[in-house]
Amino acid sequence: MAAHSYHFVTRWRVRGTVEEVGQIIGDADSLAAWWPSVYLDVSELAPGDEHGVGKVIELHTKGWLPYTLRWRFRVSEVRPPGHIRLEAEGDFVGRGIWTLAQDGPWTDLTYDWQIHAEKPLLRRLSWLLKPIFAANHHWAMARGEESLDLELARRRAATPAERDVIAPPPGPSTMPAGPLLGLAAGIALIVLAIRRRGASR
């Protein structure tokens, strides 16, 4: 696998039906509302058919690290209520597959995300900082599970008073760039020192 290639399999478990959860996951236009820690801006470029196949969404996203990503996806396959496949391009190039399965009162979600990072920062530094970039993805997905659980609770609330007591979803990270740059410089120095020691033997 190339240094800038990534393959993540994320599993969530939330209380609700596949139909409830699938309605939220399949509504890309609402991502910035219920998952604002990651989705800063979402724009629909093409509507797709009655199931959403062919829909094209443009995204501006981030994780806890101090950089943002601009990319888009096209929904290439939908099998209601529990399967959505999308194709990504831009700062990410690859594909993602959502699979939902009912388990009693719970829905188990699996997101299989296989991409190449094409943003210059990620492409050039993945050989060095891949574990940190991977941790950034895991942080984003953990916020997603938390935010989905809150969104399900909001949608079930019977009155405005019930809705008001539900916590808002977590917002974007405000981590400054300094720590990341310092960490990258430190790792680079360690790698260079190891290489020089190996070359001198």
Q: PLM features: residue spans?
A:
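Glycine-rich portal/gate segments that line the openings of hydrophobic small-molecule binding cavities
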Residues: 19, 43-95, 105-108, 143-158, ...
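Terminal "cap-and-tail" regions of soluble proteins that handle hydrophobic small molecules
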Residues: 2-4, 14, 103-201
